[in-house]
Regions:
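DnaQ-like (DEDDh/DEDDy) 3′-5′ exonuclease domain used for proofreading
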Residues: 1-67, 74-89, 93-96
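Flexible, glycine-/basic-rich loop-and-beta segments that form/coincide
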Residues: 148-195
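Short, solvent-exposed loop/turn and secondary-structure capping segments
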Residues: 76-81, 123-125, 139, 179-182
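Conserved nucleotide-binding/hydrolysis micro-motifs of P-loop NTPases
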Residues: 72-73, 117-120, 144-147, 172-176
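Short secondary-structure boundary/capping segments
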Residues: 60, 81-85, 126-131, 154-159, ...
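Conserved Class I SAM-dependent methyltransferase catalytic core
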Residues: 87-141
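A short acidic (Asp/Glu
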Residues: 54-55, 122-126, 151-153
C-alpha cells in the first residue's frame, strides 16, 4: 500500500507545534474604547499569535472577512519589529498564524493577505497548503507608486519595485458569495466638478 503523496512546502521546524500555546485572558481597557459599547469589534494590542489564541475559542467559524498585512521580511529592522528573519522562521511564523486564522473564518469567509515580492511566492504555496489550492480566489496587484520608466527617476538604472500583492483565499470557494460588479473609473477632476 503506497502512502498518499502531496505537494507541500517544507522547512526546518515546520512540524514544531504551536497549538500548545495557552490562550491568554484579554483585559478590556475602557480608555481605548469609543463609540458603540455593544459592538463585537475588538482591537488587541500585543503579540498577534497570543491574541489569536485568546479569541480562537469564542470566534471559531464566525469571521466573514480577515485582512492581514504581515511583516514582508525585507531584511530591515524597524522600531517595533524585526523584518529580517531567516526564511524558515518567517514561514513558521506565518503558518502558525494562518492555521488559526483559517479556523476563525466562517465557511463562506475570505482572507486577504497583503505582501510584497520578497516572500509572495512562498506565501502563495503556504496558503495553498493551509487553505487548499482549490480555495485560491485571486492575486491582486496593487500599484504602490508611480515610477518614471525603468530608471525610477534616475537614482540608478535597475528596474524599480512598484507593486505589492494581495492574496485572496476562501475557506470554501464554493460557498464564497459573488462580488458586486466593477465600478466605473472616474477621473479625480471629474469627481471634484460634480461637487
Amino acid at each position: 500500500m503506497s502512502k498518499l503523496q502531496k505537494l507541500e512546502l517544507t522547512w526546518i521546524g515546520k512540524d514544531d507545534r504551536h497549538e500548545n500555546l495557552e490562550p491568554r485572558i484579554l483585559i478590556e481597557s475602557p480608555e481605548y474604547s469609543y463609540g458603540d459599547t455593544n459592538t463585537e469589534n475588538i482591537i488587541i494590542h500585543g503579540d498577534n499569535l497570543l491574541g489569536l489564541r485568546a479569541i480562537e475559542d469564542k470566534y471559531t467559524n464566525s469571521i466573514k472577512c480577515i485582512y492581514i498585512d504581515p511583516p514582508y521580511n525585507t531584511g530591515e529592522a524597524f522600531e517595533n519589529y524585526d523584518d529580517n528573519l531567516e526564511h524558515s522562521i518567517w514561514l513558521d511564523l506565518m503558518r502558525s498564524r494562518l492555521m488559526i486564522l483559517r479556523r476563525l473564518l466562517r465557511e463562506d469567509g475570505t482572507i486577504w493577505i497583503q505582501i510584497d515580492d520578497e516572500e509572495q511566492a512562498y506565501l502563495k504555496v503556504l496558503c495553498d497548503e493551509v487553505f487548499g489550492r482549490s480555495n485560491f480566489v485571486n492575486m491582486i496587484s496593487v500599484n504602490m507608486k508611480n515610477i518614471a520608466g525603468a530608471s525610477g527617476g534616475g537614482e540608478d538604472k535597475r528596474m524599480k519595485k512598484n507593486c505589492e500583492y494581495i492574496l485572496v483565499y476562501a475557506k470554501d470557494y464554493s460557498l464564497m458569495p459573488l462580488f458586486n460588479g466593477p465600478y466605473a473609473y472616474t477621473e479625480m477632476s471629474d469627481l471634484i466638478q460634480q461637487y
